[in-house]
Amino acid sequence: MKNILLTALISAGCLSAYAQSKPGKEDDYYRIITMPIPETIKMEVGGLAVLPDGRLAASTRRGEVWMIGNPYLKGDGKPSFQRFASGLHEPLGLLSRGKDFLISQRGEVTRLEDTNNDGVADVYDSFARWPLSGNYHQYSYGPVAMPNGELLVTLNLDWVGRGASQSKWRGWMLKLGEDGKLTPYATGLRSPSGFGSYKGDIFYTENQGDWVGSGRMTHLEKGDFAGNPAGLRWSKEEGSPVKLTPQDVPNTGEPLYDVAKKVPGIKPPAVWFPHTIVGISTSDFKEDVTNGAFGPFAGQVFVGDQGHSIITRVDFEKVNGVWQGTVFPFREGFMSGIIRMVWGLDGSMFVGQTSRGWSATGKADFGIQRLVWTGKMPFEMKNVHSMPDGFEIVFTSPVDKKSAADQDAYKLNSFTYKYHQTYGSPIINTQEVPLKGIVVSEDGLRVRLVVDPAVLRKGYIHEIKAEGVKSPDGNPLLHTTGYYTLNEIASGTPVSASQFTTTVKASAPDHSMHTMPAEASNTAPSAKRVIEMPKDWTNGPDQVVTIGTVPGLKFDISSIQVKAGSRIKIIFNNNDDMLHNLVITKPGTANAVGEAGLNLGLKGSELSYVPRTNDVLFHSNIVEPEKSEAIYFVAPKQPGAYQYVCTFPGHYTLMQGKLNVVK
C-alpha cells in the first residue's frame, strides 16, 4: 500500500494535465509489459494471486501452480519460476490465505499447503466437493473472498447443444464455509468465470449463450435468478433460496427487464456489454482500489474479455437503490484471452491469459502481462450519470467548450436484446434518442445532454457517442462511445431551456420499434446467400462440400478445390459451442472483410456480421451451435486462391481457409 500511495503522489502533477498535444493512443497512457516465460512452461492461467512478499502465484489449466519471483521484472528483468503444485484438474481460480491456498478443480476446492517450507506443496486436502457429470463444459471457478471474509465459488453449466445442469448445483453461485460446507446462494448462471465484490456487493459476469442475449454484469443477492433456467433444476433442493422453477420462465423473446417485471425473482443485469462491440466473452473483473496509482478511474471496475483480448471499464452508480452504469472500451492488444486479473503491490495490474479451446484475438496460446499507467492523463468520458431528462457526462479533463456545445458532436440511441432460449440475440427495438439541449459546465468538465424524458426507456442500453467532442488542443476523446444500461431514471429537477448552452432544433423522435425475430433478423434475401437449390440446377450441384469446426477457432477443412464455373453446394455444420458464419471472399481479402465485419457496430447482428462489400462473394447466415446451413453458388470463372472466413467478430484472424478455383 505504501508503494501505491507513493506512486499516486509522484503522479499527482499529471492528474491535472490536459490531453496531449497530439491524438493519443491507448499505449500512451497504459503500457502492456509482457512477462518472459520459459518455453517448457505452459502458463495457461486459470488463477492469479499476489503474495505479500512480492511474488505472483499462478494456477494453470494444465493442473499446476507456479510461484513467480520478480514478476515486476526489476533488476535484470528476469522472473523466476518454481512449481508449487501439480496434478490438479483444470483449476480456474486461486486464493492465497497466507499459510495456504484454496483452489477450485473440476470437482472440488482443494487446500494446498507447504508444511516443511521447501517451496513445494505437500498437503492436498479436499476442502469441499461437488458431483461431476463428465461433461467438458463443467468448469469450476474460485474461491473468491468477499470483504467480510465470506468465500464464493461458481459452477459452470454443462453444454449438450444447450446449457444443462447435469449434476447438482451446476449453474449456481455457492457460499463456501470454513468447514467446507457449500450453501446455495443464487442461480441462473451460465458461464460465471468472473465474480466478486464491488462496494461490498456481489457481482458476476456472464457470456452470451442460450438465454443470454449478450454479455452482462449482474448484481446478485441471495435467492436471485440471473436468467438461464438450467440451474433451476435444483431449486427445490434443501437449502435453496431460489423459489422459481424451470416452468416459471417464459420463452417469449421479450426483453429480460420486461420479463423480470412479470416474474418475481428474475434479476436483470446492472450493465450490458453489447456483443462484439465491447467484447464477446466477459471474464474476470477488478474494482480499482489503487488510490490513483492506476490512473483517474479510482473506484471504477475493469473487466476482462477472453475472446477479444481486451479490458473494458465500467462506471457504476446506484439509482433508486438499483445498480446500473456505463461500459467503455479501455485497453486492447493483449497477447491471448484474458481470464484473470489481479492488482500488483505497486498498483499495476497483472493479466493472466489463455486461449486453448476457447480462442481469442490475441494470437498467443497463453501469457502473463502487466498493465501499467504511464502517468499521462487520457482524455476520456470518466463518468456518465442518469438525469431525470437525460445524461450528464463527466470528463477526465476540460473539453473545448465550442465543440462540446455542438449538437452534431453527439449521437444517442437505445436498444436491447431478446430473452429467449435461442443462443444469443440480435439487437432489437433500436430507437434514436434525440437531443433537446446541451449544457456545458463553466469548468468544461461536465456536459449535460437533455432529452425528452419520454424517450428514455428503462432496461435499455443507451449508446452515447461523443465523437465530435474535442480537447482544448483539438484532440478527440481516446474512446468516443459509452453504453449506459438504464434500469432506473434518476430523480431531480430537469434543466430548463433557459439554461441550455445549445438549444437543439426540435425534430420528431423516431419511436419506431425495430423488433426483429432472432430467426429472421439477419436473413434478408441476397444473391450472395442462396439457401435453396436453384430451379435450373436440374441435375443438382456438381460438387457438395460439408465443412465444420474444430477447437481453436478453425474450420475442419483448411482447403477446398472446385472447378471454375461449377455449381457448388457447401453445407456449413456448426458443431462448435459458439456462433459462426461462412463467408467466401475474393483472393487476399479475408482479413479486410473480417475487420469490416468487426466494425459494423449496432448493425452487425442484423447483417450477420457480413459487410456490404464487393470483396464478399457468397456467405451463410450466422449459424447457431449444433445447427447447419447450406448455401448454393456458381464458382468464379476466374481461377485463383479465393478464401473463406468466419466474420463473427474476433474470429476472422484464425478461422480461415482457401477455396482454390481451378480450370
Specify the residue positions occupied by each region the protein language model found.
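Beta-strand cores of secreted/periplasmic/IMS beta-sandwich domains, seen most often
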Residues: A49-V50, R55-L56, E64, G196, ...
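Extracellular/periplasmic metallocenter environments
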Residues: S521-I531, N614-K663
